[in-house]
Design a protein with these regions (language model features):
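Beta-propeller blade termini
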Residues: 1-4, 51-62, 128-138, 198-208, ...
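Short glycine/acidic-enriched loop and turn motifs that connect beta-strands
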Residues: 17-22, 74-82, 150-155, 220-223
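Blade-edge motifs of beta-propeller repeat domains
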Residues: 24-50, 95-126, 166-196, 229-274
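Solenoidal tandem-repeat scaffolds enriched in leucines and small polar residues
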Residues: 1-60, 66, 71, 78, ...
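Hydrophobic strand positions within the blades of repeat-based beta-sheet folds
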Residues: 30, 70, 91-94, 110, ...
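A detector of repeated loop/turn-to-beta-strand junctions in beta-rich toroidal repeat architectures
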Residues: 23-26, 85-90, 104, 156-161, ...
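Acidic/hydrophobic-patterned starts of short beta strands in beta-sheet-rich repeat architectures
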Residues: 6-15, 62-71, 138-148, 208-217
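Extracellular/lumenal glycan-associated surfaces
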Residues: 15-17, 71-73, 122-130, 134, ...
Length: 274
């Protein structure tokens, strides 16, 4: 939820997941009850040019209006359908304004073939599998942290990565973006096959210094899973001094009642209602 038209009330968007006639995921704007006194009779507006399986709202161009950012990670190689994301996955941006977000609005699409975005679009990268919005550099404009858990690091398949896209007055783009993985200098540990770094991501100002810290889930790390945490700074998340918080430290492992659940599996950024 977020205020995309600055009327003082938050709008809700529903991301309905893959459908038979729309694998990329239909998006609906929920304007609230259309029948007074009946909270179930909501007026849903279809946004036919928008897609997404997960999303977040934040002001990524600094104009005071909330913007909707969605992710579609599954490309045709994974979906088995040509009606899927750009090779390797993509995110979309719908900018808010005085009229909010409207049905005739065409989103801005960003992927790993976009100018300035680190890496290259490859089958199964899952760019956009998770995403989070927050001001990572303290400039007053929201940035977007994008999970890329299927990214290969060298020959290490599914080692995973995360990409920070910087918000700016001109809108979100690849300019100044930064990629992180477990081979990046300053990040503890080492990239390993099937770690799935970036399966979950979150930006939050944990230190109350107006710069969001970055949290990245690595749920397949060893038997328990980890979350990597880096403090925010004017340059964005700082890898020097960053730490891993792993399940074993909290008495959590991938064994027991839920052997397929791991620490780092759950962070905000994967919900279908925004």
């Amino acid at each position: 939820m977020g205020d995309v038209d600055r009327d003082g009330r938050a709008e809700r968007f529903w991301l309905l997941g893959s459908a038979e006639d729309d694998y990329r995921g239909p998006v609906r704007l929920d304007n609230g009850p259309s029948v007074p006194g009946n909270p179930l009779a909501n007026a849903l507006v279809r946004l036919p040019l928008a897609d997404g399986h997960r999303g977040r709202i934040g002001d990524v161009n600094g104009d005071g209006y909330g913007d909707l950012v969605t992710g579609i990670a599954e490309d045709p190689s994974m979906a088995g359908s040509p009606d899927a994301a750009h090779l390797g996955g993509e995110i979309q941006v719908l900018y808010g304004g005085p009229d909010g977000i409207t049905a005739d609005q065409r989103p801005t699409v960003i992927h790993q073939d976009s100018p300035g975005v680190p890496g290259a679009a490859e089958r199964g990268d899952l760019f956009g599998a998770s995403l989070s919005l927050g001001d990572a550099d303290g400039d007053g404009i929201a940035d977007v942290l994008v999970g890329v858990p299927g990214e290969a690091i060298g020959k290490l398949e599914w080692a995973g990565a995360a990409v920070l896209l910087r918000g700016a007055e001109g809108g979100l783009s690849g300019a100044g973006s930064v990629a992180y993985n477990r081979s990046t200098a300053g990040i503890p540990g080492a990239a390993e096959k099937d770690d799935a770094f970036g399966s979950t991501v979150h930006l939050a100002d944990l230190t109350k210094d107006a710069r969001a810290e970055a949290l990245v889930g690595v749920p397949a790390e060893n038997s328990d899973g980890c979350v990597w945490a880096a403090r925010g700074a004017a340059s964005g998340p700082v890898t020097a001094g960053s730490v891993n918080h792993c399940g074993k430290s909290f008495g959590i492992t991938g064994r027991g009642d839920h052997p397929k659940a791991h620490f780092g599996d759950a962070l905000p950024g994967v919900h279908r209602a925004v």
